[in-house]
């Protein structure tokens, strides 16, 4: 399948706008879904990370609304699980509708309601919102969607993970009428598919032939994956050593808790690393500001975050993703890794892994890379002192010396047993002798357990 946007039924004016946004050729899932959407079908779409999911529904929505006379009211409602994703979808719609009369607003938490109500007075054709704020306004009777053409639920699997199943059906019951409903997600399991069928009344399921799996598939060819075995009390210093020596300029560090995000930001800033935090307890204007600063800077920068931006958010040119703790969830690892290696931009994904996390993480990696992995020897971590005046010059040490976490099979099907990242944190400073002895003891313990 190799269609152009013109063959999919997209108008020349919109095609020109897409080219202005560097969208020249439809992806496989766009080729499948856009014609079905334009035929007013209810859809369940599997659009993995990096396949242009927002454009999958954004393009046909704009195309449909431009062909119909304006009703002077909201005609499209898009519901997303997070504020950041809702804002990104809004920005995409604004870019696509740049040369049209269509108006787009967002309804998200963290923004005063009166400001959003004032925007609604302009009768926008497209509203993008989070579940909480949209339901709040519906329950108050402040807004009504009486002439809705399209209802779009984005990242439905994440909504279910966050316990929004009941609210999804409450939303459907409160919207009096809509012509078409479409559900989109980067991954599907049995519960997600069953819920999506109920929501769409057995809508058409669409997935690109090479992507009919239960999880998103980042392009592993563009992402070098590494694992760093270390002790938990060395993680902070290891992170500092990594960001101080790598060539990467744009780094996202994923943490499991909001408290840890704040702790790491304070720690890295004290050691003169330009760092910004991002998590759900931050005020909305701070979240937006930090994400923009991270996305637009050309200087080396670190964004420390929870899984708030692990799904759906696209930041151009991310060089490296760091998992501060080993992921135990297959989809979480893939979504985090998918923040880099986008649009033919090579990236790295590095995971800090302690001894008790090792076995579970290796099994996860076998799923990701579709191959069995032999037990791997732990590395002996050499750390550079904090604020060390004699530390190596930034950019001098590349990641080329680090071996990939997966092992290429020999011709007879067996796998080599190799160390993973012995040279990752090389430094001019020698480790104290007592630490070296301690590491030797721990190394022997790990080795005996393999």
From Swiss-Prot:
Its EC number is 3.6.4.13. Keywords: ATP-binding, Helicase, Hydrolase, Nucleotide-binding, RNA-binding. It catalyses: ATP + H2O = ADP + phosphate + H(+). Residues 429-450 are annotated as: Disordered. GO terms for molecular function: ATP binding; ATP hydrolysis activity; RNA binding; RNA helicase activity. One of its GO terms (cellular component) is cytosol. It is an enzyme of class 3 (hydrolase). Residues 430-450 have a biased composition (Basic and acidic residues). InterPro entries: DEAD/DEAH_box_helicase_dom, DEAD_box_RNA_helicase, Helicase_ATP-bd, Helicase_C-like, P-loop_NTPase, RNA_helicase_DEAD_Q_motif. It comes from the Bacteria. SMART domains: DEXDc (SM00487), HELICc (SM00490). Residues 234-384 form the Helicase C-terminal domain. ATP binds at residues 47-54. It holds the Pfam family DEAD. A motif (DEVD box) lies at residues 154-157. A motif (Q motif) lies at residues 3-31. Residues 34-206 form the Helicase ATP-binding domain. Belongs to the DEAD box helicase family. This is Probable ATP-dependent RNA helicase MG425 homolog.
